[in-house]
Swiss-Prot record:
It catalyses: a 4-hydroxy-3-methoxy-5-(all-trans-polyprenyl)benzoate + H(+) = a 2-methoxy-6-(all-trans-polyprenyl)phenol + CO2. This is Ubiquinone biosynthesis protein COQ4, mitochondrial. Zn(2+) binds at residues 203-204, 207, 219. GO terms for cellular component: extrinsic component of mitochondrial inner membrane; mitochondrion. The keyword Lyase applies. Keywords: Lyase, Membrane, Metal-binding, Mitochondrion, Mitochondrion inner membrane, Ubiquinone biosynthesis, Zinc. It comes from Eremothecium gossypii (strain ATCC 10895 / CBS 109.51 / FGSC 9923 / NRRL Y-1056) (Yeast). It is found in: Mitochondrion inner membrane. Lyase that catalyzes the C1-decarboxylation of 4-hydroxy-3-methoxy-5-(all-trans-polyprenyl)benzoic acid into 2-methoxy-6-(all-trans-polyprenyl)phenol during ubiquinone biosynthesis. Its main location: mitochondrion. Its EC number is 4.1.1.130. It holds the Pfam family Coq4. Its cofactor is Zn(2+).
Amino acid sequence: MLRGKATVAAAQPRRTFVLAGMLSLGQLVIGREARLADAMARGDLHNKNEDYQAKQLQELEARLQGLRNTRPSAPRYEGHVPLWWHEKALLFGISGLRSFFHPENGMNIVQLGEAAAIPCFLESLRRTMLSDATGRRILREQPNISEPDLDMDKLAQLPTNTLGHTFYRWLRKEGVTPDTRAPVTYIDDPVHAYIFKRYRQCHDFYHAITGLPIIIEGEIAVKALEAANIGVPMAALGALLAPLRLRAAQRERLRNIYLPWAIETGLSAKPLINVYWEELLEHDVDQLRAELGIRVPPDLRLIRQEQLQRRRSFKMKYESFEN
């Protein structure tokens, strides 16, 4: 009798627990069904409510309008983000520090370039283009440099001594593409924005026609060439400050070979911003270099390999002498 009472008493808590669990599960299911029903009634599911999309568009436009109200002006071209002067100063400072410590992150370089592209520099570049017939045509036609526009398959079939094949070969060797160039975002004037976009897109042609790779020393040399030739502020900053983080052997190569070459070539060459590269793809690359006043520097990769081999050979001789 006592055992039976004890069994009944022990079973009651278990039944209570099971009933409570079933009740909670039922509330969860019923509550979920109720929420689904409410969502369907509002048109949140399957867009059954005809006003749903219109409401969503209104909410999106309201958010965008709220964002526009915080900007100093309305956007003046696709992708334009107007900044206040203090935001530009902050962008310059932060992107400058990030570019110095993390030059491998291309977005840091992109933001620093636009932050440093002050209007007086861009206006000077515009006057340079307006003073030249080809430059004026570039401003008028505003061509775009991309793989589809250039027809890379066609460039691959061109004779090896042409600019087009040289450009194609350099892109494939370095594993890059002109399509990776970021759009201009923070420059306010639409004409200035296109000029900076053009400068940015032509950067790979400067590499290809000089044969300089995209390793850090090659980038610094091309930046120094750009600074001397067209006066790009960010390029000048890069040429001056970037070598500070390099090893002694790298700084020595830049100081003795590539920076003197870049400054001399940049100052003596024709303004590269006025070159309509897309129309010269079938031209002989050596003849084009002569016309532009560009002298090819020593092969950077080859010099690096030769110097590395000499250091290794010297180290082996020293170690054998020690033993």
